[in-house]
Amino acid sequence: MTKKEALSIVFSCAPLYKENLVDKSLLFITTDKHKSVHCLEVTFDISNFLHMTGFKLCKPGINARHFFNLCYDKRLTEADFEFSADGTTEMKMRVLPSLMKKNLSAKMLGDYNMSQPKLYTDKIAGSLSACMGFVRDGGEGRFVPNTVLEGDIRTKVKAADRIIATYRKSRGEEQYSEIVFTAKKVEWEKIVLPDEYCYLVSVSYTHLRAH
């Protein structure tokens, strides 16, 4: 992959990231093999985009927020960055476009299984071909993205729980009202959500009736 090709990818992904994910939170509702229900909230900011690209910045004056704006405005140049020596930049470029969706194209979620020695992340959401990793932000409970990965999520997590629904909200909103993914063949009447998210049952039913 050339730098020109990589620039083309980040230039096309930056507007999608801003439109679909920046200043938004996603809430994943999952079920494990015992049918227990779990929830994970993740939050996105423009400063997370640099981690997703694997670009190594050459100029000290470019921080993560500036980097995103340069990509968004198509002003980043080949002289501004290098590829990571271990090949991860090219890998991230291959999967980044498929992850810039409202729901990350994610069907499964799990705890990272430490299978890649140099990779640090906590939670992974994804599919059979592309995944996104999340870490706690400053230990305050908020999960933020810190990497993207190529390949089958089932090889990267301890147990791949099924995502049955994904909700999205903007930063200023108190509650989730937009549903951006629902799995097929979910017995919603049997799903018991944690108290803080029990209001989502009506959101789910409204969505299902509309579809």
Give names to the regions the model predicted.
Residues 1-115, 197-199, 204:
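Compact soluble domain cores
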Residues 9-10, 29, 46, 62, ...:
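Weak global preference for isoleucine
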Residues 55, 158-161, 194-196:
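Surface-exposed beta-strand edges and their flanking turn/coil or helix-capping segments
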Residues 95-187:
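Conserved binding-pocket/active-site segment within a compact domain
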Residues 181-202:
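Catalytic "initiation/cleavage/transfer" segments centered on a nucleophilic residue
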Residues 206-211:
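Conserved small/polar residues in nucleotide/adenosyl-binding loops
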